[in-house]
């Protein structure tokens, strides 16, 4: 049984808890968030505007949230170094704050007594792993790892399949991305990203993303071959990647579909999906896969130039991969 703790009880932290509770080999021991009390933690876990009410029983006492009779300690520490991970015998701390995402800051969990750390955000210093793509490169000496971003988790499996079959010369990615907590409900100050300060619910907002470049970190053969940008749009969840690539080998769109379908039914089953249905974004709410290729949405201009479209639940799919990575780290 792997004993885990979750630091940061936001969108990803709460969904990671939902997913972890469904795994028989994981015990969630504690959550930490300096901004919430146990009664509020129970409320936020029980009710979810996007993914619906939790199906089980959720209560609380002064020091715990109690889910289906299972007590989970709630801490309110701002500094992870002060958390009781040692006395609670935590195997893996999951940091979903978006704050402690580099090796030096995530080290605070190790200093507090956790054996290992999984960061639920891209990191410029911690090694990044995408389940289905490069988790086999993980070695037990790595104490702190990153699960990359939701968009990298969508793009990387698709890029891996295409590159292995046809070779990617170069490519541009656009993610049409649902709004997130970093955006504003009305126009407000956002000094680093002026456009990002505009009303989230009423605008399509161009934004930067490192997701495509990060693919080069998990698939070194694609280093320098991909870059991308984002449009933030007024949907609450589910996003879609548009990958436009120049291939090394000539092919047909039917052959591309065949290769992706085979991968989705084989080694990438559960990570990469495939559909030919006339789907829209809400059809993927709660989908646990990282990337669902939309065969009827893509187009081909010439034998080496194609546009590929793949959907992802940027909350639930990503949270599922976080727990998958935790399991992989624990076993290896």
Swiss-Prot record:
Keyword Cytoplasm: yes
A Pfam family per the record: Gp_dh_N
Active site: 150 (nucleophile)
GO cellular component, one term: extracellular region
Enzyme class (EC, first level): oxidoreductase
This protein's UniProt keywords: Cytoplasm, Glycolysis, NAD, Oxidoreductase
Domain of life: Eukaryota
BP GO annotations: glucose metabolic process; glycolytic process
Localization of this protein: Cytoplasm
Subunit structure, as described in the record: Homotetramer.
Family: Belongs to the glyceraldehyde-3-phosphate dehydrogenase family.
PANTHER family, per database record: GLYCERALDEHYDE 3-PHOSPHATE DEHYDROGENASE, GLYCERALDEHYDE-3-PHOSPHATE DEHYDROGENASE-RELATED
Protein name: Glyceraldehyde-3-phosphate dehydrogenase 2
Protein species of origin: Candida glabrata (strain ATCC 2001 / BCRC 20586 / JCM 3761 / NBRC 0622 / NRRL Y-65 / CBS 138) (Yeast)
UniProt gene name: GPD2
């Amino acid at each position: 049984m792997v004993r885990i703790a979750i630091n940061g009880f936001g969108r990803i932290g709460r969904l990671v808890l939902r997913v972890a509770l469904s795994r028989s080999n994981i015990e969630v021991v504690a959550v930490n968030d300096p901004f919430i009390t146990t009664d509020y933690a129970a409320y936020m876990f029980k009710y979810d505007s996007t993914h619906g009410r939790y199906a089980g029983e959720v209560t609380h006492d002064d020091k715990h949230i109690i889910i289906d009779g299972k007590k989970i300690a709630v801490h309110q520490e701002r500094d992870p170094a002060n958390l009781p991970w040692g006395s609670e015998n935590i195997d893996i701390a999951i940091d979903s704050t978006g704050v402690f995402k580099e090796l030096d800051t995530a080290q605070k969990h190790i200093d507090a007594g956790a054996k290992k750390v999984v960061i639920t955000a891209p990191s410029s210093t911690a090694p990044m792993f995408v389940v289905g793509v490069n988790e086999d490169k993980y070695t037990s000496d790595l104490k702190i790892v990153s699960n990359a971003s939701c968009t990298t988790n969508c793009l990387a499996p698709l890029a891996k399949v295409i590159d292995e079959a046809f070779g990617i010369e170069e490519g541009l990615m656009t993610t049409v991305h649902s709004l997130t907590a970093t955006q504003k409900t009305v126009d407000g100050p956002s000094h680093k990203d002026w456009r990002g300060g505009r009303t989230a619910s009423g605008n399509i907002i161009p934004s930067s993303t490192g997701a495509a470049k990060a693919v080069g970190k998990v698939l070194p053969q694609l280093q320098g071959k991909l870059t991308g940008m984002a449009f933030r749009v007024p949907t609450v969840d589910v996003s879609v990647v548009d990958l436009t690539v120049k291939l090394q080998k000539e092919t047909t769109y039917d052959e591309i579909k065949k290769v992706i379908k085979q991968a989705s039914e084989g080694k990438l089953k559960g990570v990469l999906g495939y559909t030919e249905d006339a789907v829209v974004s809400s059809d993927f709410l709660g989908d646990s896969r990282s990337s669902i290729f939309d065969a009827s949405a893509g187009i081909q201009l010439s034998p080496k130039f194609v546009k590929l479209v793949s959907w992802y639940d940027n909350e639930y799919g990503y949270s599922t991969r976080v727990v998958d990575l935790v399991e992989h780290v624990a076993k290896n």
